[in-house]
């Protein structure tokens, strides 16, 4: 617990430096297995919340499947879960994961990997527009511009089509 407090306090310090912006830290610790990871993030979240630090913890490692996402969410292991879209096995599971997080007061980050395709990014944009996660990953690629433009352009297409349907 002593090391957890030190990590939380350091994260709190970083949160102060980041002000006025909110700081989200993905995977501040990486434990040896799912259970240990969940417990560590749960303990970190409690300290961060109790001390009202300007930081949110994003669960990533050991939180891969729909079952994992529900497990971390139910245990409040972090403030947000990174939903790795390629790992969930189907669009239905991505939708369920986002909606589960939202209905259980857990932030949802519709993420993925940098080696996805432009088509998977476009499909994920549709899922995001339908489900409203707190954050989405601009993908594919490691650069910023390409992923941002693919996702942004697809979202603009969705909004334009929606507007046409109103007429």
Go through each PLM region and give its residues.
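Catalytic core of soluble alpha/beta enzymes
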Residues: 1-130, 137-155
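Expand to "…catalyze enediolate/carbanion chemistry for C-C bond making/breaking, isomerization
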Residues: 167
């Amino acid at each position: 617990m002593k090391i957890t407090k030190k990590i939380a306090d350091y994260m709190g310090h970083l949160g102060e430096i980041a002000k006025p912006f909110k700081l989200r830290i993905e995977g501040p610790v990486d434990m040896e297995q799912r259970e240990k990871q969940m417990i560590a993030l749960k303990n970190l979240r409690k300290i961060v919340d109790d001390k009202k630090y300007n930081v949110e913890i994003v669960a990533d490692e050991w939180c891969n499947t729909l079952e994992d996402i529900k497990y971390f969410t139910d245990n409040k292991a972090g403030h947000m879960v990174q939903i790795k879209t390629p790992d969930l096995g189907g669009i239905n599971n991505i939708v369920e994961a986002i909606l589960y997080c939202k209905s259980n007061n857990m932030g949802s980050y519709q993420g993925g990997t940098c080696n996805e395709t432009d088509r998977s990014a476009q499909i994920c944009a549709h899922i995001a527009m339908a489900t409203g996660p707190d954050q989405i990953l601009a993908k594919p690629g490691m650069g910023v511009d390409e992923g941002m433009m693919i996702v942004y352009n697809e979202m603009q297409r969705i909004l334009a089509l929606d507007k046409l349907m109103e007429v």
